[in-house]
């Protein structure tokens, strides 16, 4: 609709229509406009007719009754006005108070004048842009908006019609159309229809207009302008014509106070002044106005006509109507018109006006008694004429002559509707006027004005404006050749118009006063400043202020005055300066002290027009000219590029589908096309996302965001590469998107930002934010950090526009309750501090300006300090009393009640007030008093202490919530209030000092402190001890019933730490004694001096409980007040506080009296519990916890069940948790339930996320930093799923918080999102991270609980009871709570020794989540050089992708030492500090910067940790006790380690990978770290997008880099104590494990005495658990073999061929009578190991050997080396050396001339030792590798079993991957990551069989336990041989030799073997994963087929690998079977060394 278009666009359309209509001849017949016009209808061929057509169209659109007649009148109903005023009451001019809540409505009974405002074009001429456009030059804007018609005279509204109906009529004084109906008949004529938009602006001037006083009737004749003869009105019409462009001028005017009717009478005064001042020429500073008649006392009694007098050349009426004259009018009108100066002077004008006024008086008397006049004047009276002389003008003619003229216009009414003999037509008077404007001429028009339509009853206003040649050029259309003659000349004209009343009711109210009208005296004249708008709307007089109305408008106001001063010269010019002197007098910025200032709204409107920006519009709107906008596209085209178009693709099915998805979602589209049709909505969504999301998500790269397939397809459809259609200059030539064949989705353009034309049409400045953000993004001048700064500034600048409700904090004076006692005390305190300042001002300033203490005389200082302190104490008491008083009814304090009653979301913030107000720490009381005085006075005061400013800022921030309006945004206020509360808690908690220097004050200051610590009896008769915590004063003995009604928010819990202000410091004790003495001397001060006020008001009762209660309210007792006082959140009693429920009291008395109210502190004893499990110290109470008596527990449980709306599962948990039940009762009391409902739902949200009927095998406990914060829970959920907690993902804390705001159904409800039971820990209403098929975390149920949840202890107890109730079930508790959390230290207490309970202590989850943000800037490239675009392929968080690498993968990808600078940020940490190098590694480990070399206190909560803990919990035998596991040890897989000193400031290159022909460049997918399962990396490479086009949360396999420096290679180890060394299996543990297998031994398998008090690692427990399954019942005794015979291989009935590696679960084991006992094997193993260790230590001491990394590795700075994270190789973390076990293993491997491939497991008992049964598979050391693969070299079945040192497996071939995905082997030895440098040994030192000379083979026949099968320790180590060269067995083999001895498989191995048919290692298959490890599977796939099945051995030589437990737990292939080469192996010539 036309009315909803921008203002300038409406003006442009109106001006074009008027200019186009003005080209037609005046008497041409009506024409029909084409498509380019406004309508295809009959339009009058004149500018006036064009405007009339617009008006008629608007009247018909608005539904008002409209009728047009040929005489230029349009009659409309009053509904026309009612439809205009409400819609446009604030568009241009609204005189209402901007500070009020709602703008004042425009009065409907005011006169309405329809004016068109000017086009505010700053500093340029708009007339040249459009054809016929009329626009002023605004190079000199005025301090007021100007309202003038663009063409034609002014419009006004009349409500009288000839037929007597009271319909409004819009009348034009100028209309040249033919007569189509009789004007007197009143028959309405249908208005001309127009298809275009209508235009009218009337209400703005209507507000300025008031009803004018009565003006006498016009004369019947006027004198001739040239001859001085009176001529008739129709004769005047022959030679006078009214100019179509009557403009207002800045003419001084007079105004008087409005009458009761609301009008002004200034025309009469104008006439008096003009009559008195008879200037000869009228060219001075004061123009002349003739007498306009005497003013009347009433408005609207008589009819008045506006008389226009013009001096022009007389023309013949017949000649004017001839066709020839019409043709020559345009050619001759400017040359034939002489200047107006030649016709009359100012004296003549004065005489003419005087004569007209005299005749008007005579006509008034005649018409008064005429009945016809009275009948026609009803309902509107007739008004007298208004004669107004225009300002002097000058123009420059074509002859170069400077002319001065005065333009006057006149409108003559008809003679009561009778036909005039001199007129052309019956019943009409033709009024013509012409204006001489020098050589420029004027546009001649004429009009017919019926008398009935020219009865004005409104107000008159004059607006000044300096009109430049642009207006005249538009007015004189077709005469552009003469425009250069008036470049520097100004034409000042004025237009006087009047308005009529639109409603009949107002006129009827004025009728009884018509006959009682009597003239009255004129008021005093009031001279107005030129350019000021005089308006009397509803009795308010408004003028332009001389000063800016608001400080924020001062810069704009100065600029406006500067424009005026530059454009207009100073005042004082003479008469010869022409209009310059007049302009100076009109527009000089002089002072007007006698006038009132304009309201700020008007000033804002003035500056808005001057700057072409609407400053008053809500949200800030900017008006854009319609001519600057591109044309709307055609039907089948849309906007494209800058100004181009392209064909619309709305019919495409993909586009339609994308449009439906966009309209259905609430997020912004990453690809927006014009076919969506929601450009404004997309703009708004982009603005919201930019203002709320972290800046790290904003792309800093030049290219656009990465799109998925669906979005790229949409770009391909709608954004063709050829640039689109070249229609109307669009496409590539006009800046079209894309060009050539370049993909539009990867260009620098923003695919999600719509075309800017939509934002320009909307006008809101906030919609430009996405475009500005994109401009910063694509700018290549700034880097990422600079762009972040610019975006931050952009966000700060646009914050008031996006969040208009955010307002600055206010003080106590803005309290909505002026009668609050807080306000009264604050006022008294302000007076006291003002007195202090006055005393200080009298004294000389101290010499030391740094001194903040008062330098006053002693007596005056004491008096002032006492008064201030007493007032401050009263203020604080009033605050406390307000809280107590409101606490009884459940409302906050008085000064917060008004806010919290309107906003429920503010209640939570208001409830935190008692937290600081209850804190009464003596060290800061005087500062608090000064703070309140500062807030009350809002001015700088003399601070008596040093930290006044800090406290002032804190409490100002706290009170910011009181200033939030009803509809405002409270997020900023909440954030500011939280900061204030934290600061107050620190300062008021005793952390701040009293003075800046720390010195004690004098006696006067001590007295002031004593006043604020009342220790004596107060006026209320209540004694409250307020001494130091932990110490009671002598004057206030403590009693069991006196409970301190306050709690320190910053005080630590009792029994753990001492408070910071305890009396353990001697200085504190001395200060207490000094204050006690001062308290005795000033004890009566409160009652004596502070009892009455200075003004004699009522005394202020000073007491701790506050002032007396209001009248009629019973004052409760002190005990009642103390009991009703609510406890602050997080209340913890301090040491020495006496709590209710004294332990010494009788329990019966306790229960009978029920001393503990709801929410009171509990007695320090064991809480009653009906559960035996709870009585085992799982849940215990500490002093200060909320306590609920038994009598109140049952009703509270019923109310809890109603609140939860679920079954009684969690109700039983609350029954066993009295603390949680009491907390619920305290928060759900009837008076508080309404306000705290939202917070209570958040604290009970865990009941909706967890089902009470589920068994949870993994419980994760976290701590919330602040109430309602789900950050730690979200990070724990991210760790569970192995995802990163990026903003916008399912693990985003904001998503959790939003989900909690909307209550969701219980966890039992079937939800499509709850597809897997492992997702039970997520809120049901949010998108959850997708878990891979291999992710088995939470299969048995995972729970996420916070220590701040209500019922936390009961929930943990219930979950543990249900999880451990099943036989054979274990439950793991991962405690990730913060040590600083008070609630975490209190409960729950887990039972010791509970079967099946695994308790692990880890660091908070948020400390382990990091991300790698690579730099994408130009870097040095070997191929492209420096500056070439080198894209970093390292993994990073893709923009807009919720899925991100997991914590451990992101940590591995972290490369702080890489060549390019990489920024490491802690996600969701504000502010995000970039961490590089050592700080990044320290952040990865959970430490802080600068903590290098320190131990990490706790391990991380990673996905790998949880996965292994969950697996241990499922597979561990619950019969074993693991309670001590949580004391010192935990499972940790550190993602990185801090770099060594040699690499602190250097860089490291990326680790190389194996190169192959199919993988050029060595790029092949790497497996994940050891912290993940072995099958985790075998998941197929999923796409980054799903089918629906949305980002997928699956991790994409990419190249990972390790952040391990060479000196500290971390491994997957079991950390204990100092968290630096691996777990070692002690001898006692093996003895205890072996003793368990004795049938007579029934004790605990691992008693604490056997472990020596040390904890046991879970990996060791798993291994021992496997061995325990092979007990005496499952392992029968085997026959003892003879010497030289091997053990028979165990056979199973029903099993498959054992050589195929397949076993049947029901297979039987064959007896092996001769097998050593596990105890014997372990003892011999340990003895041999100790002997080897001793030898190694001796060599190390002699210095004959050293342990150092390889020199090649040491030189390669960028390579990670050492063992992988899953290589638990016993590396010594304490000293940075290898363990002796590793040295021994390397020595043995070097003797065998075969490098060690793999290190040992967790036990670290040696190198690669294998159990060999029978003779070696090789005949000699030289032929070991060749004989291992031949069939003849297989061991004989009859070989005698023996334990001999076995060489390591042969060298593996390099791994290469073909296209089929299988690996091929090549002969390649494995590399040793560490170089062993022993002393040189000769070849003779080695025996021929490869064993050392000193090594003796192990005699299996010796020692007890013969006949038992060989027991293999679970430490993944094999037993070394003790046999020497002389005892070695013959290495030759026979075909009938016995196979090697195979160990009896454990039940765990048996279960794994069922699902691993394709693997040769059944014991290493993981049944939970459902797949075999990738390395094993690939080996099985590439092994050549053989007719004879292979034996189930892990080695090539028939040896058995027994590291199944360790390999399975670590989630990796067994040692020796890894599909990858060891970390650190180097490749040279395709062979690994």
From Swiss-Prot:
Q: Where is the composition biased (Gly residues)?
A: 732-741
What InterPro entries does UniProt report for this protein, alphabetically? Herpes_ICP4_N
Skewed-composition ranges (Basic residues):
1592-1602
Q: Please list the residue ranges that the record marks as compositionally biased, kind Basic and acidic residues.
A: 223-240, 313-326, 1294-1303, 1575-1591, 1752-1765, 1774-1795, 1853-1869
User: Where is composition skewed (Polar residues) in this entry?
Assistant: 1912-1921
Low complexity compositional bias: what residue ranges? Answer: 1-16, 157-173, 507-518, 1031-1056, 1169-1181, 1812-1843, 1937-1948
Q: Where in the cell is it found?
A: Host nucleus
Q: Which GO terms describe its biological process?
A: DNA-templated viral transcription; positive regulation of DNA-templated transcription
Which GO-annotated molecular functions does the record name? Answer: DNA binding
**Protein's UniProt keywords contain DNA-binding:** yes
| Compositionally biased intervals (Acidic residues) | 359-368, 1086-1097, 1927-1936
Name this polypeptide is given: Major viral transcription factor ICP4 homolog
**Source species, please?**
Psittacid herpesvirus 1 (isolate Amazon parrot/-/97-0001/1997)
Q: Provide the taxonomic classification.
A: Viruses, Duplodnaviria, Heunggongvirae, Peploviricota, Herviviricetes
């Amino acid at each position: 609709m036309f009315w909803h278009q921008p203002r300038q666009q409406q003006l442009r359309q109106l001006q074009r229509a008027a200019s186009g209509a003005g080209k037609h001849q005046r008497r041409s017949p009506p024409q029909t406009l084409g498509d380019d016009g406004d309508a295809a209808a009959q339009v009058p061929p004149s500018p006036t007719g064009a405007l009339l057509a617009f008006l008629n169209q608007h009247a018909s659109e608005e539904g008002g009754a409209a009728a047009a007649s040929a005489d230029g009148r349009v009659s409309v109903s009053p509904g026309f006005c009612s439809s205009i005023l409400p819609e446009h009451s604030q568009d241009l001019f609204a005189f209402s108070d901007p500070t009020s809540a709602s703008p004042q409505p425009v009065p409907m009974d005011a006169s309405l004048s329809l004016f068109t405002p000017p086009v505010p074009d700053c500093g340029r001429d708009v007339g040249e842009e459009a054809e016929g456009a009329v626009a002023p030059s605004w190079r000199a804007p005025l301090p007021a908006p100007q309202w003038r018609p663009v063409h034609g005279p002014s419009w006004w509204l009349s409500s009288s019609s000839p037929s007597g109906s009271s319909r409004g009529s819009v009348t034009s004084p100028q209309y040249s159309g033919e007569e189509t109906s009789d004007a007197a008949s009143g028959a309405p004529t249908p208005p001309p229809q127009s298809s275009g938009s209508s235009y009218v602006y009337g209400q703005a001037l209507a507000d300025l207009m008031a009803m004018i006083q009565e003006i006498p009737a016009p004369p019947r004749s006027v004198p001739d302008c040239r001859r001085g003869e009176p001529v008739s009105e129709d004769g005047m019409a022959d030679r006078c014509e009214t100019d179509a462009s009557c403009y207002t001028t800045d003419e001084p005017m007079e105004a008087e106070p409005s009458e009761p009717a609301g009008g002004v009478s200034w025309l009469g005064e104008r006439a008096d002044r003009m009559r008195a001042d008879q200037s000869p020429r009228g060219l001075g500073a004061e123009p002349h106005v003739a007498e306009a008649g005497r003013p009347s006392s009433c408005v609207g009694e008589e009819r008045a006509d506006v008389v226009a007098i013009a001096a022009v050349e007389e023309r013949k009426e017949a000649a004017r109507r001839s066709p020839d004259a019409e043709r020559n009018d345009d050619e001759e009108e400017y040359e034939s018109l002489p200047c107006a100066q030649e016709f009359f002077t100012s004296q003549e004008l004065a005489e003419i006006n005087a004569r007209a006024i005299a005749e008007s008086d005579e006509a008034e008397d005649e018409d008064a008694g005429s009945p016809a006049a009275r009948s026609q004047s009803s309902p509107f009276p007739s008004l007298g004429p208004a004669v107004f002389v225009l300002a002097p003008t000058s123009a420059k003619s074509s002859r170069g002559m400077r002319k001065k003229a005065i333009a006057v216009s006149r409108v003559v009414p008809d003679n009561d509707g009778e036909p005039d003999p001199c007129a052309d037509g019956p019943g009409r008077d033709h009024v013509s006027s012409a204006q001489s404007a020098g050589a420029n001429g004027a546009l001649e028009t004429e009009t017919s004005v019926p008398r009935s339509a020219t009865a004005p009853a409104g107000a008159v206003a004059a607006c000044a404006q300096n009109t430049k040649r642009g207006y005249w050029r538009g007015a004189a259309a077709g005469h552009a050749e003469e425009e250069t003659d008036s470049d520097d000349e100004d034409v000042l004209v004025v237009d006087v118009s009047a308005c009529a009343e639109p409603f009949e009711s107002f006129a009827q109210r004025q009728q009884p006063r018509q006959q009682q009208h009597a003239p009255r005296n004129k008021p005093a004249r009031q001279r107005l400043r030129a350019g000021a708008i005089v308006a009397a709307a509803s009795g308010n007089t408004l003028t332009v202020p001389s000063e800016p109305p608001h400080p924020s408008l001062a810069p704009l106001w100065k600029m406006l005055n500067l424009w005026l001063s530059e454009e207009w010269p100073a005042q004082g010019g003479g008469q010869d300066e022409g209009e310059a002197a007049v302009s100076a007098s009109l527009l000089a910025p002089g002072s007007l002290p006698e006038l009132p200032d304009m309201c700020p709204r008007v000033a804002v409107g003035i500056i808005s027009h001057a700057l072409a920006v609407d400053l008053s519009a809500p949200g800030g709107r900017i008006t854009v000219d319609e001519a600057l906008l591109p044309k709307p596209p055609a039907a089948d085209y849309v906007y494209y590029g800058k100004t181009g178009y392209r064909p619309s693709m709305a019919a495409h099915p993909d586009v339609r589908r994308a449009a439906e998805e966009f309209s259905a979602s609430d997020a912004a589209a990453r690809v927006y096309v014009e076919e969506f049709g929601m450009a404004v909505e997309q703009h708004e969504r982009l603005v919201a996302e930019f203002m709320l999301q972290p800046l790290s998500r904003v792309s800093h790269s030049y290219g656009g965001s990465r799109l998925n397939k669906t979005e790229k397809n949409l770009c391909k459809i709608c954004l063709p590469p050829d640039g689109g259609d070249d229609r109307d200059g669009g496409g590539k030539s006009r800046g079209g998107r894309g060009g050539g064949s370049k993909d539009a989705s990867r260009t620098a353009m923003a695919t999600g930002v719509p075309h800017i034309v939509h934002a320009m049409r909307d006008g809101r400045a906030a919609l430009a934010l996405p475009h500005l953000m994109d401009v910063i993004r694509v700018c290549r001048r700034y880097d990422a950090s600079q762009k972040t700064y610019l975006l931050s500034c952009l966000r700060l600048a646009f914050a008031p526009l996006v969040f208009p409700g955010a307002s600055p904090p206010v003080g106590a004076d803005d309290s909505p309750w002026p009668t609050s006692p807080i306000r009264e005390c604050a006022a008294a305190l302000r007076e006291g501090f003002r007195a202090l300042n006055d005393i200080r001002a009298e004294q000389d300033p101290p010499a030391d300006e740094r001194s903040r203490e008062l330098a006053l005389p002693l007596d005056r200082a004491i008096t002032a300090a006492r008064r201030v302190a007493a007032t401050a104490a009263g203020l604080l008491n009033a605050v406390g009393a307000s809280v107590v008083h409101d606490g009884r009814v459940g409302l906050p304090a008085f000064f917060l009640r008004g806010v919290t009653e309107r906003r429920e979301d503010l209640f939570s913030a208001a409830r935190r007030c008692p937290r600081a107000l209850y804190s009464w720490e003596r060290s800061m009381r005087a500062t608090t008093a000064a703070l309140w005085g500062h807030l009350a006075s809002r001015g700088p005061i003399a601070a008596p202490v040093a930290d006044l400013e800090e406290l002032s800022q804190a409490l100002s921030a706290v009170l910011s919530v009181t200033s939030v309006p009803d509809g405002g945004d409270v997020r900023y206020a909440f954030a500011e209030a939280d900061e204030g509360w934290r600061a107050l808690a620190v300062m008021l908690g005793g952390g701040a000092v009293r003075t800046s220097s720390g010195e004690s004050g004098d006696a006067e200051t001590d007295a002031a402190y004593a006043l604020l610590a009342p220790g004596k009896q107060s006026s209320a008769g209540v004694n409250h001890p307020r001494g130091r915590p932990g110490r009671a004063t002598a004057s206030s003995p403590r009693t069991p019933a006196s409970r301190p009604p306050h709690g320190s928010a910053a005080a630590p819990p009792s029994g753990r730490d001492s408070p910071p202000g305890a009396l353990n410091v001697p200085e504190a004790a001395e200060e207490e004694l000094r204050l006690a003495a001062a308290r005795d001397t000033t004890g009566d001060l409160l009652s004596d001096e502070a009892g009455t006020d200075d003004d004699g008001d009522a005394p202020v009762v000073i007491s701790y409980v506050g002032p007396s209660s209001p009248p009629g309210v019973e004052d409760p007792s002190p005990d009642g007040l103390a009991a009703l006082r609510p406890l602050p959140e997080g209340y913890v009693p301090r040491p020495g506080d006496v709590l209710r429920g004294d332990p010494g009291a009788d329990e019966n008395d306790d229960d009978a009296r029920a001393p503990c109210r709801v929410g009171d502190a509990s007695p320090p004893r064991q809480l009653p519990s009906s559960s035996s499990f709870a009585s085992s110290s799982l849940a215990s109470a500490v002093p200060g916890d909320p306590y609920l008596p038994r009598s109140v527990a049952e009703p509270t449980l019923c109310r809890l069940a109603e609140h939860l709306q679920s079954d009684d599962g969690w109700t039983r948990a609350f029954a066993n948790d009295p603390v949680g039940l009491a907390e619920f009762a305290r928060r759900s009391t009837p008076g508080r339930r309404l306000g705290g409902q939202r917070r209570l739902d958040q604290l009970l949200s865990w009941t909706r996320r967890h089902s009470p009927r589920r068994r949870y095998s993994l419980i994760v406990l976290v701590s919330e930093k602040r109430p309602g914060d789900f950050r730690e829970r979200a990070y724990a959920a991210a760790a569970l799923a192995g995802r990163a907690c990026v903003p916008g993902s399912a693990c985003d804390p904001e998503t959790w918080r939003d989900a909690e705001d909307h209550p969701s159904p219980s966890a039992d409800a079937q939800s499509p999102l709850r597809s897997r039971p492992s997702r039970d820990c997520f809120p049901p209403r949010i998108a959850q991270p997708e878990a891979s098929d291999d992710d088995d975390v939470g299969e048995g149920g995972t729970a996420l609980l916070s220590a701040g949840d209500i019922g936390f202890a009961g929930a943990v107890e219930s979950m543990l009871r249900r999880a451990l109730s099943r036989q054979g079930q274990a439950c793991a508790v991962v405690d990730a709570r913060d040590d600083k959390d008070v609630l975490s230290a209190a409960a729950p207490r887990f039972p010791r020794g509970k079967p099946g309970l695994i308790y692990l202590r880890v660091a908070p989850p948020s400390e382990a989540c990091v991300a790698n943000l690579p730099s994408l800037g130009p870097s040095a490239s070997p191929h492209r050089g420096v500056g070439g675009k080198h894209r970093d392929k390292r993994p990073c968080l893709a923009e807009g992708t919720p899925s991100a690498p997991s914590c451990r993968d992101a940590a591995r990808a972290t490369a702080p030492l890489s060549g390019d600078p990489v920024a490491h940020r802690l996600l969701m940490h504000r502010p995000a500090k970039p961490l590089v190098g050592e700080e990044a590694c320290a952040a990865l480990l959970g430490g802080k910067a600068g903590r290098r070399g320190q131990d990490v206190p706790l391990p991380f909560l990673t996905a790998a940790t949880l996965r292994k803990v969950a697996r241990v919990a499922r597979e561990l035998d619950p019969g074993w006790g693991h309670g001590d596991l949580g004391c010192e040890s935990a499972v940790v897989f550190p993602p990185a380690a801090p770099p060594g000193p040699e690499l602190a400031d250097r860089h490291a290159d990326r680790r190389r990978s194996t190169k192959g022909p199919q993988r050029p460049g060595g790029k092949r997918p790497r497996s994940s770290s050891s912290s993940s399962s072995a099958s985790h990396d075998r998941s197929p490479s999923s796409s980054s997008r799903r089918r629906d086009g949305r980002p997928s949360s699956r991790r994409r396999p990419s190249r990972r880099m390790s952040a391990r420096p060479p000196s500290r290679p971390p491994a997957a180890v079991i950390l204990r104590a100092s968290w630096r060394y691996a777990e070692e299996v002690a001898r006692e543990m093996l003895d205890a494990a072996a003793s368990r297998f004795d049938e007579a031994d029934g004790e605990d398998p691992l008693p604490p005495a056997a472990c020596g008090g040390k904890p046991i690692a879970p990996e060791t427990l798993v291994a021992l658990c496997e061995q325990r399954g092979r007990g005496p019942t499952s392992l029968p005794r085997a026959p003892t073999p003879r010497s030289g015979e091997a053990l028979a291989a165990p056979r199973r009935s029903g099993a498959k061929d054992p050589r195929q590696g397949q076993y049947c679960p029901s297979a039987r084991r064959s007896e092996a009578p001769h097998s050593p006992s596990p105890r014997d094997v372990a003892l011999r193993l340990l003895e041999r190991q100790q002997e080897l260790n001793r030898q190694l230590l001796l060599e190390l001491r002699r210095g004959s050997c050293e342990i150092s990394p390889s020199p090649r590795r040491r030189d390669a700075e960028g390579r990670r080396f050492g063992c992988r994270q899953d290589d638990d190789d016993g590396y010594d973390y304490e000293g940075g050396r290898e363990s002796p076990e590793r040295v021994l293993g390397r020595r043995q491997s070097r003797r065998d001339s075969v490098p060690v491939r793999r290190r040992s497991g967790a036990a670290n008992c040696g190198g690669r030792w294998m159990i060999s049964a029978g003779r070696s598979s090789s005949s000699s050391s030289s032929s070991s590798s060749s004989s291992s693969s031949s069939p003849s070299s297989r061991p004989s079945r009859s070989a005698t079993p023996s334990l001999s040192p076995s060489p390591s497996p042969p060298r593996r071939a390099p791994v290469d991957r073909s296209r089929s995905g299988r690996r091929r082997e090549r002969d390649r030895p494995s590399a040793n990551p560490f170089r062993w440098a022993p002393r040189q040994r000769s070849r003779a030192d080695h025996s021929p069989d490869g064993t050392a000379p000193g090594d003796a083979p192990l005699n299996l026949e010796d020692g007890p336990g013969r006949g038992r099968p060989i027991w293999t320790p679970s430490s993944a180590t094999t037993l070394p041989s003790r046999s020497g060269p002389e005892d070695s067995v013959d290495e030759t083999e026979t075909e009938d030799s016995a196979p090697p001895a195979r160990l009896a498989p454990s039940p765990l191995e048996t279960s794994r073997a069922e699902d691993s048919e394709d693997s040769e290692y059944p014991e290493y298959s993981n049944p939970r994963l459902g797949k075999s490890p990738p390395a094993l599977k690939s080996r099985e796939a590439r092994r050549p087929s053989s007719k004879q099945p292979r034996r189930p051995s892990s080695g090539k030589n028939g040896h058995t690998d027994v590291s199944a437990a360790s390999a399975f737990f670590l989630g990796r292939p067994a040692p020796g079977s890894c599909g990858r080469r060891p970390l650190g192996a180097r490749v040279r010539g395709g062979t690994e060394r």
